[in-house]
Amino acid sequence: MNRGLLLSSDVKSRCWPWASSYPRSEVQAPVLTDPVWQFVPWLEFARRELNAGRLPLWNPHQNGGVPFLGNAQSAIASPLFAPALLLGVERGWNLSLLLRILVAAVGMYLWLRDVERSRAAATLGALMFSISGPSIAWLEHPISMVIASIPILLLLARRLAREHSGAGFAGVAVATYLVLAGGHPETAAMAVAVVAGATALEAHGWRPRVRTALAACVGVLLAAPLLVPFAEYLSLSAAAQGEDRAVFTLSVSALGRFIVPHATTGNPITEASTVSVVGLCLALFGLGHIRRSRQVRYWAGVAFLIVVVSYDNPVSRLLALHTPLYWTRSLILLPLALGFLAATGLDSLRSLAKRRLGERSAMLAASALVVMAGAELLAAARGVHAVTPPEDVDPTTPLLRRLTTESEPFRILPLHTFLPPDSATALGLDDVRGYDAITPRAWLREREAMGRFTSTNIVTDVLEPRNLAPGGRALDLWNVKYLLLHPQLPYTAERLNSEFGLDLEEIYLGSDGRLLRNRRVLPRARLRGEGTVHVTERRATRWRLDVDARESTVLVLANPMFPGWRARVDGKRAPIASRTGTPIEVRVSAGRHTVEISYEPLSFRLGAGMCVAALFVLGMIVWRIGWS
């Protein structure tokens, strides 16, 4: 981390418009591009909105406009993301990653100490969990924030199940929030299920189980401002219908990565599994307690189930085909189970050594095994992530500078792999494409009128020039003013006009790309009848328009409708008749009007109300039963 930011920004040397000017070298981590194309642009957008005093509820720069807080993976409400959110990418990104590792290690150590493992065994488990192959591989992704918080939840849930206190109740609620706010609901659900099983095993009687479950429910309510908008967005997404879902399991040959972490076959991220050979052997030794210990049986069962649902077999194939979850993601939970088993195995081995060699020799041997496991894991972690100098995170080009200086509302349509989806979010440009786990289903249907979108090996959501729809009417209606493409592609304005009936003119050609202007583009805000519209205020979640209509007509704002958008004409609520995914339309009478169109999602307000109620309930419970 001292050499630069753990980011694969060097992938931009293979993508336009940066390819001609970005320092060209071999891409260090070609599969770790999601942070570059998704998470960093989202972070920069969130910082812009928060610095302006606005909640980043809506992202106008992706897929025509989509919920931002509701996409879950933005993860801006997680304390583990706070360093990056407060300090920016250059100063805060690595701090956020380091914080995730530290929280995971400390939480795992404290939990293992609480279940009566020795210091050496707890240290071993902490290393196996916090710097395991899966933890390091997914470190730049939001999923790592979910995983880092699990041992803390295990620790506090175990204590609450054994001793009733206000502090314990509040601790479980807050730890549950940390897991849910991490930015990966799929993994969070798996984690909560694992913690629930472990807690039920520890609790004696139904009362401890009920109070622990109630505390977790309060934690769910604390996260409601994130979960309720996510549920709404998911219900309207293509993902809810299983569209574009990759159905896969991990090859059985990928089990070799437990022994050889840098094997060259398969995907080095999804298949990452090493917990060190030392740790794996100690975990197998810990299975010797499987008959005597319910805890060992439970965590051995968890490890077995994770392997079964992740690696190729009839069960995993059935789950992959017929359920909406990516079960291979559960592999990131495996170091938790193996860490517990290895800690148990180390203490068992130490007890045997103590009887034969004495206390001091047994302690030295245990410490040596911990050091060996840590060294093995650190060696395996080297080279997983790329290192980017801070000055290379946000390179710009003449073409991009030209676009970002234009003040009027417009959309762009990069063709082929030019400016990969979501990159526009960092630049403040409105793109019709997007790259996200969930995408509005209705918008994808509307967008088909622009052309046939596909994917390539390196970029998702691609419109090739040859796949443009004839006529270009959808480009005009949706305010797509500029088409961007590689300078070496043989598609000039004249050729596209001739082949597809467009009306484009080339206004820029440089080493960084070709910029074509759509001369037929319609304004973002316009009237169907005669009159004028002036945009006086434009924010992510609010538009203010001065309208002068000569007759009763319809005001069209060419942004895709989504639940939560509201309209007011001269301060009075006005109906929006548009269907989800179609342009926002508001009827106005003849004359001058001030129209405000704002995003006020009921889902967020409902979630915020649930959060406030949870805080009140939490305060009352702590006050009633006392803190300690």
Model-derived features: where do they sit?
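Membrane-interface helix-loop junctions at the exits of transmembrane helices
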Residues: 2-3, 50, 81-91, 120-141, ...
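Active-site lumenal/periplasmic loops and adjacent helix-entry segments of GT-C-fold
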Residues: 2-115, 120-149, 261-267, 578
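Extracytoplasmic
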Residues: 11, 15-18, 248, 371, ...
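Periplasmic/ER-lumenal interhelical loops and adjacent helix-loop junctions
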Residues: 12-50, 54, 216-289, 316, ...
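Active-site-proximal, structured, solvent-exposed surfaces of multi-pass membrane proteins
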Residues: 58, 433, 508-511, 519-628
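Membrane-embedded helix bundles of polyisoprenyl
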Residues: 105-114, 119-203, 212-230, 236, ...
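Membrane-interface junctions at the ends of membrane-embedded or membrane-associated helices
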Residues: 115, 158-169, 200-211, 288-294, ...
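Hydrophobic, aromatic-rich transmembrane alpha-helices
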Residues: 275-297, 304, 308, 354, ...
